[in-house]
Amino acid sequence: MDSPSGPRVLSSLTQDPSFTTSPALQGIWNGTQNVSVRAQLLSVSPTTSAHQAAAWVPFPTVDVPDHAHYTLGTVILLVGLTGMLGNLTVIYTFCRNRGLRTPANMFIINLAVSDFLMSVTQAPVFFASSLYKKWLFGETGCEFYAFCGAVFGITSMITLTAIAMDRYLVITRPLATIGRGSKRRTALVLLGVWLYALAWSLPPFFGWSAYVPEGLLTSCSWDYMTFTPQVRAYTMLLFCFVFFLPLLIIIFCYIFIFRAIRETGRACEGCGESPLRQRRQWQRLQSEWKMAKVALIVILLFVLSWAPYSTVALVAFAGYSHILTPYMSSVPAVIAKASAIHNPIIYAITHPKYRVAIAQHLPCLGVLLGVSGQRSHPSLSYRSTHRSTLSSQSSDLSWISGRKRQESLGSESEVGWTDTETTAAWGAAQQASGQSFCSQNLEDGELKASSSPQVQRSKTPKVPGPSTCRPMKGQGARPSSLRGDQKGRLAVCTGLSECPHPHTSQFPLAFLEDDVTLRHL
């Protein structure tokens, strides 16, 4: 219980014109109910200047056992090392392998960058302060530490949301994404993600809330303990637009992704096919459910990592900060920072092309993952080429991918699509074009080599002009531009004899790169 004279002494301190309490000292007072800590703050004479007060008790300690500091310090060190090594491996592998540098994978690289910076700026500082059982880096260091944790944490959350929205559009609305998958557009989205994170991380520097010590006073965060309208308003808006709204968007996107996959699976089940065809469709559905499970794990880990920290802040927001102990503030902060080690495992190590790239560029890690780059490369190339051949021959929407296929891990990696996404997007495109998913004859034995398209390279794709080709009916696609000076609607020839231009009929312009075109033999 606090000393009865505590409020009167604190009032005398704040009323003295020579004493100006800093946000850090206010945060210490508001963030702890420990008698010894508040006694250190109240022991300052009313006539002491602000500079002398800061030098006397800049960051007092919490009366907890030493092993509590050492345990948290060890955990945060292990989390930081794992996050740094894991995310650095992701960044290195994606940068070394050209086939992985696709617009879709740029989101994963951005996620790895933000998580890497989170681990670098948080773990060493937290660990050092835990060893000495007090904050070592002063008020400026406290503000910088908390700012880095905020901006990199928010960036990771919003990047996860951008990934979910990107997969949602690609799978459920493939025609709407025509012409929108460029690296430049993705870079603009990522720039918006970082600006959004900065917009919510900078206000404490300008008086809207503050960055103060928290928990065991060996780390810092924004002030969520002070029960004032200004601080409560910032806390409420921060959680609404940084935690709850992104979480709702992620859940919404993956619900519709699951529904698209399920509808595609039902369309396959309704077809009277041979046992070989049914077995392949069943394997495809198993792959789809595997992706669904990975998405579910992403959402659960996202919630589990940040829910404890959010709960603590919301308890203080509701006015019950007096029931919070130092442990209840520090432990959730460590759990939230541990989210930096989840994303490399989920989004990268489970990515088949990434696993092969690790085996190629980091053979030692490839052995640990049980992947051989030399053995996996041909099979992936064959599978990707095989699927491109099937789709370009049998459908009015040919999912064309990639540049320099011999140098990449396969056409699939160029676009950044998984088998599941291709299948679900295929089904959605068939429904949009008014055709049955089952009407496409995709059996290997039913495809003749003489009818397969031949890949030819050209600097600028040749696309049929509106004067000689009819627009494709039922698609409604209006791509604004195409590389090369080609613009216009999605078009298709009614017959090769009616169009003098050599080109592949019936393809979405969005998936045609600047150096690869398909031409008829």
Swiss-Prot record:
Residues spanning the membrane: 72-92, 107-127, 144-164, 188-208, 238-258, 294-314, 330-350
Presence of the UniProt keyword Ribosomal protein in the record: no
Keywords on record: Biological rhythms, Cell membrane, Cell projection, Chromophore, Disulfide bond, G-protein coupled receptor, Glycoprotein, Membrane, Photoreceptor protein, Receptor, Retinal protein, Sensory transduction, Transducer, Transmembrane, Transmembrane helix
GO biological process, one term: optokinetic behavior
Topological relation to the membrane, as annotated: Multi-pass membrane protein
Molecular-function GO terms, alphabetical: 11-cis retinal binding; G protein-coupled photoreceptor activity
Phenotype of null mutants: Mice fail to show a pupillar reflex, photoentrainment of the circadian clock and other non-image forming responses to light. Newborn mice show normal hyaloid vessel numbers and normal vessel cellularity, however vessel numbers are increased by P8. In Opn4 and Pde6b double knockout mice optokinetic visual tracking response is abolished.
Ranges in the topological domain labelled Extracellular: 1-71, 128-143, 209-237, 315-329
Family, similarity comment: Belongs to the G-protein coupled receptor 1 family. Opsin subfamily.
Name of the protein this chain belongs to: Melanopsin
Organism of derivation: Mus musculus
High-level lineage: Eukaryota, Metazoa, Chordata, Craniata, Vertebrata
Encoding gene per record: Opn4
